[in-house]
Amino acid sequence: SWTSGAYFKRFREYFLTEGKLEHIHLFVSRNKVFDKESVLQETIIIKVKKTSEKPETVTITSSKSNSDFGELTSLTVPYDLVVAGSDYYVYLVTDENEVEVLKKLHKFDKTLPAIGVKMKTGLTVDFRNREILRDEEEEGAIPLFYSQHIKQGKVEFPIQKEHEYVVTEQKGLMQDNKNYLFVKRFTAKEEPRRLQCGVYLAKRFPQYQKISTQNKINFV
């Protein structure tokens, strides 16, 4: 979280102003480092030098676990590519392909608000609103979309999942039935595609004026 989380912005600003990253080591596997404790944890090791002088590059190495340091992969990456922007985001690239993708991303000079688009978090926290959840459609019910409905760039509904509908009059839990891009907020590191989106087309569900989204997805 400290490398990109919003709550850690002030920490990153102080930390990376007072010091500079020299070396980052990444563990590819999340379950091998603390395998005896059965902990699934993202783990990195960093070397920081207390200085205001920015280095030209950062060394990024990676290994599968803490038992195979003899099989490291190593990259030398421009510092401005790893630590970037006014938010001091730290980008943890592991191979040349990711470096090339990052170079292309850094060329983008517009944010979503700059082009008139907003991203919001799904409206319904399902476990806090159990009384409005429904397993099947009934009179007055509207669809509740989860991350599981996002499949291969599309939004599939229904999928015979529990609690796919809600019955509510709370305006804060409903949104207009119009076209959206749904984005999964959480994906596993082991998944082949970390950014997973689905196009929601309102014309596929003309019977609804309103829909709802679970808070583990974002929508644009």
Question: For the regions a protein language model found, what residue spans apply to each?
Answer:
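Signature of N6-adenine DNA methyltransferases within the class I
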Residues: 1-117
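Polybasic, glycine- and aromatic-enriched phosphate-binding surface used to engage nucleic acids
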Residues: 100-220
